[in-house]
Amino acid sequence: MAKLSRNQARKAKNLKIRTKITGTAERPRLSVFRSHMNFSAQLIDDSKSITIVGITTAKKGSKEYHGNIKSAHELGLKFAKMIKEKNVSKIVFDRSGYLYHGRVKAFAEALRSEGIEF
């Protein structure tokens, strides 16, 4: 049997995680995605199948190095303010199969420092 690539293994982990967690209107799911150059996140209400709010480093005007830990932390602070504007304080964190380390951890800690509970 062939060895799974990193991305295939991550997708398998993500599928396993997604069967256990769902987002509701009271407690939406925060899904993160990281690529080599960018980082993005979106708040999802799975009961209505809608994205409440999303953010990414791939927009015009972003800093030159948007794939690093510092940018993920800054993005987390901005995203926390956007979440609070939507009157959401509790979320379900979906790390999408990525390890809770580096950019994912920096993003999550920035959200927690702004008072978002998960």
From Swiss-Prot:
InterPro entries: Ribosomal_uL18_bac-type (IPR004389), Ribosomal_uL18_bac/euk (IPR005484). It holds the Pfam family Ribosomal_L18p. One of its GO terms (cellular component) is cytoplasm. One of its GO terms (biological process) is translation. The keyword Ribonucleoprotein applies. Keywords: Ribonucleoprotein, Ribosomal protein, RNA-binding, rRNA-binding. One of its GO terms (molecular function) is structural constituent of ribosome. It comes from the Bacteria. Part of the 50S ribosomal subunit; part of the 5S rRNA/L5/L18/L25 subcomplex. Contacts the 5S and 23S rRNAs. This is one of the proteins that bind and probably mediate the attachment of the 5S RNA into the large ribosomal subunit, where it forms part of the central protuberance. Belongs to the universal ribosomal protein uL18 family. This is Large ribosomal subunit protein uL18.
